[in-house]
């Protein structure tokens, strides 16, 4: 049997990232502009909602469309992307409890950051900016909890997904 949960009206759940320990899950809500943390009861197969944090800055009053959620290799940093706000948000994950703490926002350096991913060895982070036809390369400093732009911009017509082989 598969567990299900009722999201808040108009939140529109979009992507979920599972922590490497398989006990925590992080769901980004497209219209609600929230990241929801769930504990996962793997014995009973239940998702237990525990925390909601905004994906947009508190002072931002415009519309938003959250698009993707992604964890770093060790499950220490959670990243969410915001399409209309043209940004990403970083959260630190408490490894004992799974709770999130907002670390800050970074400009997407382009329009409509639709997809985010790491390269296979997690040394670089990539953001596909659909409406500016660019892929932005960044480097995550997990220890400090911040992103650094590498200066590399890859031209790509309307990128919406990135895969590595």
List PLM regions with ranges:
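Internal helix-turn-beta structural module
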Residues: 124-158
